[in-house]
Regions:
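Specific aromatic-rich, kink-prone transmembrane helix
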Residues: 146, 179-195
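Membrane-interface junctions at the ends of membrane-embedded or membrane-associated helices
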Residues: 191-200, 223-224
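Transmembrane-helix signature of polytopic, membrane-embedded enzymes
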Residues: 145-164, 197
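Multi-pass, polyprenyl lipid-linked donor-dependent membrane glycosyltransferases
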Residues: 135-138, 158-163, 167-185, 208, ...
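TM-lumen/periplasm interface segments of multi-pass membrane proteins
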Residues: 2-153
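Transmembrane helix irregularities
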Residues: 190, 204-211
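Perimembrane helix-loop-helix junctions
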Residues: 214-224
Length: 224
């Protein structure tokens, strides 16, 4: 399969590539180095995640209360750790909690949150946030790799997911990267004519967040 090189296909990338020697030439040896497209995408994602984590530095140092809005470091994750009883060992949807303490996320996200709570030393809010950052980074990586595999002739397009400003700034506001990863896998499977498994992962995405329901419309049209 012919792989489309961004420095030849995209004028913006071609212009930016001048700082590294210019667009790929006709004699370029693809795959001749250890740095293949997937390793570069993983590095991009990890770097973007580090930048996103540092954007929460003020709250990590000074707490998640006062100043979280003015310093652009707000996240649902730390306050919900205590407000939803997770710090006390509560199990989402199962433990007997007051109505205003019930976790407001769909079931699969609740499982994800509970897993993070189980991996966190009891009552340590900052640790809970850090554990979630790691788990959400895994989701982000899954989304990037799935996007690269969806159209194998254009794997570099996944760099738009790896370096997405919206994910860098808001990826740890809540747990939305979980359904993003599941939907990305679903789309990759659909692109490779695996409709049954695509449906399974779309269903898992819906179990984590309701927005993947919107994909059912286009899928029905494609199946018509």
């Amino acid at each position: 399969m012919i792989s489309i090189l961004p420095s030849r296909d995209d004028r913006v990338v071609a212009s930016g590539s001048e700082v590294a020697g210019g667009p790929a030439g006709t004699r370029v040896l693809l795959g001749a180095t250890w740095w293949n497209v997937f390793r570069v995408l993983i590095l991009m994602t990890a770097t973007a995640a580090a930048v996103g984590y540092l954007s929460k530095y003020y709250c990590l140092i000074n707490g998640w209360g006062e100043g979280k809005y003015t310093h652009l470091c707000y996240s649902d994750i730390p306050p919900l750790y205590s407000l939803r009883g997770l710090a006390d060992g509560a199990i989402p949807y199962i433990s007997d909690l007051p109505a205003d303490q019930v976790l407001e996320y769909p079931a699969l996200t609740g499982v994800f949150v509970y897993l993070a709570a189980r991996l966190t030393p009891a009552g340590n809010t900052d640790w809970f946030f850090d554990v979630n950052v790691i788990l959400l980074l895994i989701c982000w990586l899954v989304a990037v790799i799935a996007t690269a595999l969806a159209q194998r002739s254009r794997p570099w397009d996944a760099a738009m997911v790896a370096l997405a400003p919206g994910i860098i700034l808001a990826g740890t506001i809540n747990w939305d990267l979980l359904p993003v990863a599941l939907v990305a896998v679903s789309i990759a499977l659909w692109a490779h004519n695996r409709p049954t498994w695509a449906g399974v992962f779309l269903g898992l995405g819906i179990a984590a967040k309701f927005y993947p329901l919107l994909l059912l419309g286009p899928m029905f049209l494609l199946c018509w």
